[in-house]
């Protein structure tokens, strides 16, 4: 089914386990399914929360609205930084894309059209996921095997597009901004997630591009508030120009 944003569908909301972390916590997937013939394009929602907070419920009003327009929206829990630092949550996102490619048809989703939405720190995760879909650090969590002891399906984590709201495209710049504004909680969130601290460079989308790493380029839509004093518009504009170069 081609996507028509002016369409209106009733939706059904359900939840299923995504996977269990090394610490024993079950990460859940919250599925917003349009009622209609489909199959519907799939959108994976990666929540914000400065890598340390929030869960699959964070963007529920938006998820419901998008699903009612004809998208199969799947919002997931991710490993939070106090449980495990970078790259754990990127591994969760990579796993979720592969999991959706295998399972989306169960909810009338078109597994050939998987896009990603990320808000704030979720946008940072989305950028890394999209730019490095086959990175062995990110795809380290295997899919479960098929029925009857069959091997897990062979799919990758490439995505069709990424839409983001105020993504942390340069986490070092946001950390420095927090230092300048004396925002201790935000500073601490960075320190917990980027452990060891040098990982703030390795996992920095702006620096990845400046290092001319070999990355996968997919369409990015970035929505950035002009008065945002958390993710500065000028920093975002620099990232966009670098990504387009």
Identify the residue ranges that each predicted region occupies.
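Mobile cap/lid helix-loop segments that gate and shape the active-site cleft of serine hydrolases
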Residues: 5-8, 131-149, 155-157, 167, ...
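Alpha/beta-hydrolase active-site loop
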Residues: 84-105
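Short amphipathic alpha-helix adjacent to the substrate-entry channel of hydrolases
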Residues: 57-75
């Amino acid at each position: 089914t081609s996507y028509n944003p002016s369409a209106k569908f009733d939706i059904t909301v359900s939840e299923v386990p995504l996977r269990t972390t090394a610490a024993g916590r079950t990460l859940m997937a919250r599925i917003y399914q349009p009622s209609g013939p489909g199959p519907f394009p799939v959108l994976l929602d990666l929540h914000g929360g400065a890598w340390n907070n929030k869960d699959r419920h964070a963007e529920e009003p938006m998820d419901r609205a998008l699903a009612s327009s004809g998208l199969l929206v799947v919002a997931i829990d991710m490993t939070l930084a106090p449980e495990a630092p970078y790259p754990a949550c990127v591994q969760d996102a990579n796993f979720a894309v592969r999991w959706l490619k295998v399972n989306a048809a169960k909810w009338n989703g078109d597994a050939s059209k998987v896009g990603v939405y990320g808000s704030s720190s979720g946008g940072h995760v989305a950028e890394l996921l999209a730019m490095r879909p086959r990175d062995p650090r990110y795809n380290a969590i295997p899919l479960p095997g098929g029925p009857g002891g069959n091997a897990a399906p062979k799919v990758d984590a490439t995505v069709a597009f990424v839409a983001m709201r105020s993504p942390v495209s340069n986490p070092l710049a946001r950390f420095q901004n927090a230092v300048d504004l004396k925002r201790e909680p935000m500073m601490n969130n960075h320190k917990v997630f980027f452990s060891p601290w040098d990982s703030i460079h390795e996992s920095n989308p702006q620096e990845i591009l400046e290092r001319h790493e070999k990355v996968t380029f997919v369409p990015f839509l970035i929505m950035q508030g002009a008065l945002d004093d958390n993710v500065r518009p000028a920093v975002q504009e620099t990232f966009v120009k670098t990504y387009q170069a």
